């Protein structure tokens, strides 16, 4: 490229384990070990791959670097909001007309992403909730989605930007089923290193599955909250919390739906509805 600087680049494919999204588990995997997070410190910038200082960044972050170098930091910051500059990739899925990947300025409101860029809901449907930043981020109610999609604003409403993966749910969606699917995913992806995550997340998944199938107990919502309390803050990496935080929010915000499953002994929403979107 005419820079006078040369380097060797290797593209090393992974096996798809979710836990390897954690930086030190990724390093362990690249070293040929099982993908399990390390205790920190030391942080990768001090002691990372094969003991050397290592920078670990997402591809999305690295893709911004050439534009910042070519056009300057001020230009990049001008694209977003005051404390969160640049653009962000928002992947919108769920019950919307136009699911897809949208690159938008940081600070674009969640309402605009769902109803303007992704086209809103199917005719006659009502919004029930939106997960703003991927499966690990707490759900937001319809009255909360006027929030700007940036790190600080979402933190103020009790959620996170995360990966920017927006999941939209309308009034056909069973929130107990949502919680059960999330918990089953995290139970499968746990590396098993930490007891609260290894034991607590599958237990949570089992409780949610029996609620979904009509075998729930009256104290299951409280038991789920207790499990969340015991998982959060007690693991080496955030994977256990990534399950506990969204489940806690779903139980808190849709408590009556969980109780209805217990009371009626079945899922009142019936089978999973087919996907709907405009092609």
For each of these PLM feature ranges, what is it?
Residues 16-19, 132, 136-141, 229-238:
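Short, surface-exposed loop/turn segments at secondary-structure boundaries that line and modulate
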Residues 22-24, 105, 136-147, 208-209, ...:
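Short glycine/threonine-rich loop-to-helix capping motif typified by GTGT followed
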Residues 106-123:
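Short amphipathic, charge-patterned alpha-helical segments
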Residues 7-9, 122-156, 252:
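Terminal amphipathic helices with adjacent charged low-complexity linkers/tails
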Residues 1-106, 118:
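Hydrophobic alpha-helical positions that pack around
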Residues 29-41, 143-160:
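Active-site loop ensemble at the mouth of alpha/beta enzyme cores that anchors a bound cofactor
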